[in-house]
A protein has these predicted regions:
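Beta-strand/loop nucleic-acid-binding surfaces
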Residues: 57-69
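Short acidic-glycine loop/turn motifs at beta-strand connectors
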Residues: 54-57, 138
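Basic, glycine/proline-rich low-complexity segments that contact nucleic acids
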Residues: 1-45, 66-176
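Structural recognition of beta-strand segments within beta-rich domains
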Residues: 44, 52-54
């Protein structure tokens, strides 16, 4: 890649197809219930995204978990059922559940487990009622406040890492 002076700044990178950025809702607090309209490819991330429309008719993009289908309902809030694609506070999620799009600070939006095929497992909830322990895909264990949100399920496109690019030109198209 080259900067405004024409000099190489990112070596061995360049070209690539033009991309339109899709604004993905990582907070999941702007709507309570929505219906999945479509599952779409996003050139800006490794996972697929789902286009959902809420009860007011406003469309949003969310990270698509594995097994989410067109027509499914997704909800967010403290009292929603444990179903794939639903976003809940960690205090409402049972121990042993696979979650993704995990917040680190309440209200900041999901920061962990957003890449294709990733998830964290809720290992335990602290007896003091303040923190939950989550094991990430890297086997790292993190303490996260119980009032942080997480989405049920595994992020879509788990085969992303096994895709064979097969030629230099395709790698260039993908800006890799």
């Amino acid at each position: 890649g080259r900067n405004h002076q024409g000099r190489l700044t990112a070596f061995r990178k360049g070209g690539g197809h033009k991309r339109r950025y899709r604004v993905v809702d990582f907070k999941r607090s702007s709507f309570a219930e929505a219906e999945v309209l479509s599952i779409e490819y996003d050139p800006n991330r490794s996972a697929f995204i789902a286009k959902v429309v809420d009860t007011q008719g406003i469309p949003h993009y969310i990270l698509a978990p594995v097994d989410l289908k067109v027509g499914d309902k997704v909800e967010s809030g403290p009292n929603v059922p444990i179903r794939i694609g639903n976003a809940l506070p960690l205090s409402s999620i049972p121990v042993g559940t696979a979650v993704h799009n995990i917040e680190l600070k309440p209200g900041y939006g999901g920061q962990y487990a957003r890449s294709a095929g990733t998830f964290g497992v809720l290992i335990q909830k602290a007896p003091d009622g303040k923190y939950a322990q989550i094991r990430l895909k890297s086997k790292e264990q993190r303490l996260v406040p119980l009032n942080c949100m997480a989405t049920i399920g595994v992020v879509s496109n788990p085969d992303h890492g096994s895709i064979v690019i097969s030629k230099a030109g395709r790698s260039r198209w993908l800006r890799k």
